[in-house]
């Protein structure tokens, strides 16, 4: 089985939105997947989708972390912590994600992320995404006005405008 096929299976076992969304996600962003393998098997993966943080009119490189998952048999072995440590090393990049539940926030905090408020309202910090991201986001429900966001990197903010969540 190819790496892409393994990633698709792992993703669908953990998340699997709709067939249309899943296909578009992998067609548009497969090249942005970070993978940790045990032998030839994908044990952990996530999408690291490039975008920009616009902070007080300054454009900063950012990566949206999406669909963080580890295969059941490899959970609680520190693999995702290792994958994060190995792949989130650019000190000029801001990394951010929308946690799938309150239960995973402690893990992200241990990985260096800070919880802030995500909003659809205007703020001095806004995420700018490319057209492919906008197409994919159009297939998703929009979040409520405020929701948790986790952020890591050199950006001292407590609110982040992010209209194009993938959920």
Range-by-range predicted roles:
Residues 146-152:
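Low-complexity, intrinsically disordered Gly/Pro/Thr-rich segments
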Residues 84, 89-101:
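Conserved GNAT acetyl-CoA-binding A-motif
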Residues 1-50, 58-60, 64, 119, ...:
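Short amphipathic alpha-helix that is part of the acyltransferase structural core
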Residues 65, 70, 76-89:
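Conserved acetyl-CoA-binding loop-helix of GNAT-fold acetyltransferases
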Residues 101-104, 113-114:
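Short acidic/polar capping segments at secondary-structure boundaries
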Residues 109-118:
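Conserved acetyl-CoA-binding loop of GNAT-fold acetyltransferases
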